[in-house]
Amino acid sequence: MCPLPHANLSMVTNEVTNFMSSLIAFQTYHLRHSFLSPSNMIPRSSNHKRSLSSGPRSLSPDRTVTKTKSTNDLAATATEKPSLATRSNSAGDIPDSGFSTLRDPRLVNNSEASDTSSTPSHHPDLSSEVAALSVKLIQAINNQTTLDDNLVATRQELEQAQNRIKSLESENEKYRHDIEQAVLIKKADADREISQLKAALAEEKAQRAIVEKSKKTIEQELETLTAALFEEANKMVAAAKLEREAVEKKNEQLRAQVKDTELLLASHQEQLAELKSVMQGMNIAKDDVEVRTTISTVPSSPDGHQQLPGIFPRSLETADPPEQSPHVEEIVPGPSTSFPHLFKSVCRTDIQAFEDFRELFSLSSASKPPSRAASGSYAGLNVMSLANFSSAGFGSASSSPAKSTHSPNGSMSSPQPATSHIPLKETRFYKRVLMEDIEPTLRLDAAPGISWLTRRAVLSSICEGSLVVEPIPPATRKYGFPCSLCGDRRPGSANERTHRFRTSDSDTAQRYPLCVLCLEKVRSSCEFTGYLRLILDGHVRAADAEEEKDAWEETVRLRERMFWSRIGGGVVPTFAQANSFENAGSAPSRHNLGDRIGDDEQDRLDAPLETYETPNHGHDHGVSDSDYDNASVSGYTSASGVSRPFYGSPKSHASEKGKDEYLEHGVSQVTLSATSDDPKSITHVEESLVIRTAKNDDGHDDDQN
């Protein structure tokens, strides 16, 4: 170590002296006042009382602690000029002079320092000792301060623990007293706990009610959804079932129609082959017939000679003359339109009736499917349709618009009818023909077997196509019911009531018997209304004025048939009339016509009613509501003859009349109308029993076998 100068040594010495004097004074003060004395701090008497306050304690006003400066500032302090007035060295009331044995080195003045600086003495270990003592002193002071703080905190914790012990002891004593007094719980606590439990229970009930309400709502929604699901499923199943049944029913109907069509086609082919053989036989007598026709059709009046070159020869040029068999007397009377090869109908179209008729085409629905038949070819709609024979042997060929198809059991099936926007009975043309033709033909007002309440039902059923005509079973004919329209009661096969009609398809509907004359009246009326329904339903259409005229001529033909049915007669060609006088003796007797019926025909007549019935409860050539079977029954069957309802096109180039084919026990006529060039013409084949009545001079009927 380098030696300190004399001045510095003196200053350090003074500082140590002052520090030691201060320490001695501090210790003396604390020993006297018993403050922070080890003897007084640790061994404290048991009766010592302190404040229970846990907060920081304030110092007593009379206890002033003097803090000494750190030894780190000794050098700075030494450079300063100490002032004796700045520090009180007294401890309490005792002056500092009584305790200080050494002078405070910090109070050394500069003069003394200057004096001592001149001292030549040197203490090399004094500085290190002073530094060590200073460090120890500071450590002791810090330890003392830490111990004092810990002591104060411990005393406070002790006081708090003692207070807690006292409170717990008091509570324990109280609980023991309650237990000794059998007071296990307080009423206030019980009430408070019960109140809490009640509140919790109410809250639980409210929550449970909310949950139950939600549960019921969910269950109700689930039930509703389940019911709706099952209902929808049931609807779908029912709809699918109905659709399946409809499809199956339609398939069955289509199969039946296909089968019936095949059978009908086979029957047509067989009959066509037979007709071809008949035509070959008819060509043999063609030359004789041409000669007879030319001779018999020459008029005797001058006017007739003027008309002959203009009308009749031209018709003979365009159409083949009627071919007659050697027995020309068997041509029966009929409407003039039944001989299209001899007569051309000319109808006026500038009358109000024609305008009313044209209104039917305008009223027909535009949505109806087009008919394959031409407008006027009404007779060609029922090709090869054969009627059942009656008990008197009067079979009739159908010229109705029914497009019949024969099923395997002999019945006829037809498609469903198409409805129109306006009923037929509301049209002006129907009201006209009802008053002019239908009512005069039927004469329901004078019918003895029909009440005035039933007359309207009969007319409505004829108009709507629901009238059913069926043969009378042979077992019922013996009772001899009178005709419901004319009241005829005469016995015999010619006047026998062979058919009956009812106004609906119901089995419980009342049946009204018909004689031969009235049967033809009903059939002609029904056929006429059936053709009007075909027009109104759109199955017969007129694209131009020519087709409208053709349809008008067809209605005239049907109205003429009603006229001849109520008259009970018809027309025949003049050559047939001339030959009828020559062969009058060979005419069949009307009253003995039943003897002319063959064994096979008699078997058919003796058959039960089911053999005559069709699926529509025994329609006799179908009075039904179908598209093609709407029309009434057909065939011209009157007392004076059976007509052949031809419809020949005015443009036909070939029209041939069938040859009469005689059977062993009956007479049947097969008629063929064929056209080669006109696309509108339709081959029409009909079969009917031909009856010819001739009276001898003595008034008796003769039979021709």
Swiss-Prot record:
InterPro entries in the cross-refs: RAB3IL/RAB3IP/Sec2 (IPR040351), Sec2_N (IPR009449)
CDD domains per UniProt: ATP-synt_Fo_b, Rab11BD_RAB3IP_like
Source species, domain of life: Eukaryota
Disruption phenotype: Leads to slower growth and reduces the fungal burden and mortality of infected mice. Significlantly up-regulates the expression of atg1 and atg12 and accumulates more autophagosomes. Leads to down-regulation of CWI pathway genes including the chitin synthase genes chsB and chsC, the alpha-1,3-glucan synthase genes ags1 and ags3, the beta-1,3-glucan synthase gene fksA, and 1-3-beta-glucan glucosyltransferase gene gel1; but not chsA, chsG and gel2.
Keywords, alphabetical: Coiled coil, Guanine-nucleotide releasing factor, Phosphoprotein, Protein transport, Transport, Virulence
Parts forming coiled coils: 144-285
Keyword Phosphoprotein: yes
Keyword Coiled coil: yes
One MF annotation (Gene Ontology) recorded for this entry: guanyl-nucleotide exchange factor activity
One Pfam family named in its UniProt record: Sec2p
Any one annotated GO CC term: cell tip
Family from the record: Belongs to the SEC2 family.
Function of the molecule: Guanine nucleotide exchange factor that plays an important role in regulating the growth and virulence, probably by regulating the autophagy pathway. Affects the sensitivity to cell wall disruptors and the cell wall thickness by regulating the expression levels of the cell wall integrity (CWI) pathway genes, thus coordinating the growth and virulence. Positively regulates the autophagy pathway to enhance the expression of CWI pathway genes in the presence of autophagy inducers.
Protein name: Rab guanine nucleotide exchange factor sec2
Gene source species: Aspergillus fumigatus (strain ATCC MYA-4609 / CBS 101355 / FGSC A1100 / Af293)
